[in-house]
Amino acid sequence: MEALPPVRSSLLGILLQVTRLSVLLVQNRDHLYNFLLLKINLFNHWVSGLAQEARGSCNWQAHLPLGAAACPLGQALWAGLALIQVPVWLVLQGPRLMWAGMWGSTKGLGLALLSAWEQLGLSVAIWTDLFLSCLHGLMLVALLLVVVTWRVCQKSHCFRLGRQLSKALQVNCVVRKLLVQLRRLYWWVETMTALTSWHLAYLITWTTCLASHLLQAAFEHTTQLAEAQEVEPQEVSGSSLLPSLSASSDSESGTVLPEQETPRE
């Protein structure tokens, strides 16, 4: 399906070129007619030359056209054509002559072999049967070679497919191993992050609790110190009152004792 746009573009280009050439031919039809007339004249001259060669006459000036004989350019053109005609004829007629010679030689060789076989007492039917048997054997050998090559190609294709499948399986195994390793790494990273996050949360909560306990203890200590500082002046005032009270009680007891001793005296 992907090769359709290039084919269409090439077809469009060919059609455009054909239309351009047709337009140019229509525009230059006079030159085309002159060229065709020249080709026809050259072909007629070549045919007449072949006829003259077949007859054994080489009188070129007798069969030249009147215009070519009068014009020096035409004479030079005909002279050049006469020089080129022999190699062109050899090129054109050489393969046909070679084929005719080969065919004649093979035909003569075949006739000579047939005459020799007939002289030896071997008929043509025997040789045809032998040739057909050899041909059948060659056909069987060719068929066997084709079958063997087809089987070898099939085996090689299967081997290539097996190698490709093994490579694909190896790649899949490697990919699976990599995926397993990546999964393990992911789980390890996830567990480590979870543990570190939980440890961090525990550490943060423990530090906050410790700080709160320390602050509470410091607050209680400060309150106790404040209460102690408030209680100390009261104790100092109470201790100062106790000696005065003891002194007053002693003085009262001293006054009472002499009064009690006087009657005894």
UniProtKB/Swiss-Prot annotation:
<keyword id="KW-0812">Transmembrane</keyword>
<keyword id="KW-1133">Transmembrane helix</keyword>
<feature type="transmembrane region" description="Helical">
    <location>
        <begin position="72"/>
        <end position="92"/>
    </location>
</feature>
<feature type="region of interest" description="Disordered">
    <location>
        <begin position="229"/>
        <end position="265"/>
    </location>
</feature>
<keyword id="KW-0472">Membrane</keyword>
<dbReference type="GO" id="GO:0016020">
    <property type="term" value="C:membrane"/>
</dbReference>
<feature type="transmembrane region" description="Helical">
    <location>
        <begin position="130"/>
        <end position="150"/>
    </location>
</feature>
<protein>
    <recommendedName>
        <fullName>Transmembrane protein 270</fullName>
    </recommendedName>
</protein>
<feature type="compositionally biased region" description="Low complexity">
    <location>
        <begin position="237"/>
        <end position="253"/>
    </location>
</feature>
<dbReference type="Pfam" id="PF15164">
    <property type="entry name" value="WBS28"/>
</dbReference>
<dbReference type="InterPro" id="IPR029166">
    <property type="entry name" value="WBS28"/>
</dbReference>
<feature type="transmembrane region" description="Helical">
    <location>
        <begin position="185"/>
        <end position="205"/>
    </location>
</feature>
